[in-house]
Design a protein with these regions (language model features):
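Rossmann-fold NAD(P)H-dependent dehydrogenase/reductase core
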Residues: 1-70, 145-156
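Residue-level signal for pocket-adjacent positions within structured domains
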Residues: 3-5, 101, 123
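Loop/turn elements at helix/coil->beta-strand transitions in domains of secreted/extracellular proteins
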Residues: 50-52, 77, 109
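C-terminal amphipathic/interface module of NAD(P)-dependent oxidoreductases
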Residues: 125-156
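Short interface patches used for recognition in eukaryotic signaling and trafficking proteins
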Residues: 21-24, 79-82, 120-126
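C-terminal helical subdomain
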Residues: 30, 56, 81-121, 130-134, ...
Length: 156
């Protein structure tokens, strides 16, 4: 959902940290932020020749209690009609995630976006913006007051 119908436009990390009540796209921004983080971390790990693998995985929209009780039967029916490609299946998505995380065939696949399966795909065009990735990374380091000695050598 990092690329919702109608799209989103990256403004700045401040929007992630302090979303406004009017902004109905904050969930999409949070997903985009996760992908930005994944891609930036992957670049940094490669730069220090690390063997750590990092990927993004979208399980799809699930009928869970995470939405604070907002997933009514009517809402689920509307999503099925209007955005069926956004829905996920708990069993299929969890099995795929477990495969990607543990199966040896994925040992050298890093910096990718998996969408409800074991096949990686391109994420949204916006998610590949390296300036935005770096901006979010730098702000995150600043806001958390992370120090070089608190992390892997060369990652910051």
């Amino acid at each position: 959902m990092h690329n919702p119908p109608g799209g989103i436009e990256w403004k700045n990390p401040e929007l992630l940290a302090h979303p406004t009540e009017e902004d109905r796209k904050k969930y999409s921004y949070s997903k985009l932020g996760n992908i930005y983080f994944t891609y930036e971390l992957d670049k940094r790990l490669r730069n220090i020749n690390s063997t750590i693998i990092v990927n993004a995985f979208n399980p799809g929209m699930m009928n869970t209690n995470f939405s604070g009780g907002h997933n009514s039967k009517a809402r689920t029916a509307i999503v099925k009609l209007t955005m069926p490609e956004r829905l996920g299946d708990l069993d299929k998505s969890s099995t795929a995630l477990a495969e990607v995380a543990t199966n040896e065939e994925f040992n050298n696949i890093t910096g990718k976006y998996f969408d409800r399966s074991t096949k990686y795909i391109n994420s949204s065009e916006l998610s590949y913006n390296e300036e935005n990735q770096l901006e979010l990374w730098n702000k995150s380091v600043e806001w958390t007051d992370l120090k070089k000695e608190e992390t892997m050598n060369g990652i910051l």
